[in-house]
């Protein structure tokens, strides 16, 4: 019997992530995945840090299917073995501080326009090679101040920020990204 659109079960490549998701949500279909607005904390409070501190999760590329998410805070905070890449859906309009703290991610892509971010988003991401931001206007901090640039305490000054071709100079002029200088590159130059 064929399943109707969206009723296919969501498959997670990482066994630990699959276990956590099954424990919190039961059977996750594609339709249910797309309707989730918050990913609950380990104690089921809606704090969006479902896998915080989990040292067994190694990938979460499936985040791209959670197209109903509005905000993510501490989502992968201190997941020291989380690697690969993540594409954050365009529905996510706020990315909280420490969201990817102390991970082994090599790439993060933000699809949203005009999203907000918290300081320390990529703190201690020593393996990071690239970040792609599709926002034409420069994303701003959720708590405006002149402290804590986007790459605050990353301990890696080789990663590149890819932005829309027509927005490169806007990003280079913005206080929170100006320190990246020539590492801010046009999206058309991106090659994995």
Identify the residue ranges that each predicted region occupies:
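Solvent-exposed adhesion/ligand-recognition segments of exported proteins
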Residues: 11-15, 19, 23, 182-185
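Short, solvent-exposed mixed-charge patches
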Residues: 1, 190-192
């Amino acid at each position: 019997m064929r399943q109707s659109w969206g009723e296919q079960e969501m498959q997670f490549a990482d066994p630990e992530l699959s276990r956590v998701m099954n424990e919190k949500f039961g059977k996750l279909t594609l339709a249910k995945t797309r309707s989730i607005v918050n990913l609950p904390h380990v104690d089921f409070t809606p704090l969006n840090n479902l896998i915080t501190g989990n040292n067994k999760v190694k990938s979460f590329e499936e985040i791209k299917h959670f197209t109903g998410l509005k905000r993510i805070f501490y989502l992968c905070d201190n997941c020291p073995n989380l690697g690969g890449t993540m594409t954050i859906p365009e529905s996510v309009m706020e990315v909280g501080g420490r969201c990817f703290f102390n991970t082994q991610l090599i790439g993060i892509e933000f699809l949203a326009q005009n999203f907000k971010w918290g300081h320390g988003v990529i703190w201690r991401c020593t393996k990071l090679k690239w970040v792609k931001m599709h926002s034409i206007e420069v994303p701003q901090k959720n708590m405006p101040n002149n402290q804590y640039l986007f790459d605050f305490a990353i301990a890696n000054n080789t990663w590149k920020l890819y932005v829309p071709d027509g927005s490169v100079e806007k990003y280079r002029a913005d206080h929170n990204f100006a320190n990246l200088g020539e590492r801010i590159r046009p999206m058309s130059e991106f090659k994995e």
